[in-house]
């Protein structure tokens, strides 16, 4: 193996999930580098932005040389398991214009400005209630035996965004334990590293495929119900929209995009809340600063998004023509991974990149992606994380980490703690 191939393989290993960044630093010595046959990774900030806006970079998973490759065949060169989660039809995240543009317009028409400017702001009160309810349950000892400790992931970061996205989409919250298990299985099975070739990894993949099929069938049944009896939620509106310029989505398109939003609600937002708490507790002086100046909380969140990108990269992209970037020519037909987590720590763009600096100037990170595939749910996620973090800081007195580093999830793309145990003096209110 070359040095780059070794660094990439190490970054993908589960044992390094808590800190892949030292291997990203090694890769960044050549900001665009080949790490496997027909697979290139991009770690430089400038180079990533160039490719994020290049029309010759395709997100159509069917064009990627790794889209149908079994995980056991090669170490990190796999994308099929990730793509399987987005239904029988490709969602907007694995599509190119014009399919992507049409689906994005259809989703945004019912989810965000200009057509639906109040959907996200109107969720603020509900989000605040969910945050308070979660802390009240912890305070009352509902979620476990005595002692002033709780799991930030299971008891706080998870319940809030999942309840919100279910309400927006029209997914019954009573079904949450079932589809939570399906999504967990899928994400654990979508392993892009060498561990996927082990017996345990193969078992995770098989379970992930079975759970993906179950989730797909569940979404199909839910959508069929909305076609029969339309309701006031985004998913129902997507398949019943007769007034929009693009018309309704097909049931399979709606299922694919609903699964995308549901998975993002389960993982990227949950991981961001957990990483905010983890980062602040690793930097206790920052908690004092935010107590004194709570108006800096949004800037603190953006700095966490830089340090701990909600999505580390996405495995569907490929190039449709030879592209020269960063002194390297990426041949047409190659897969290309834009490593947001690495670009956000590029010292040429962010001075002292390992430092957590709440007041960092010009923090134009790529934690939510860039280009046409920038995160659809970014405004909602920012609102959720802002309220969750403000409430945590206001009500949880003297929080301390119990274990550092915490255990992490298997998945490399949606990287986040599996659990985050926190000890505290008391919960106020």
Positions of PLM-derived features:
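Cytochrome P450
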Residues: 1-429
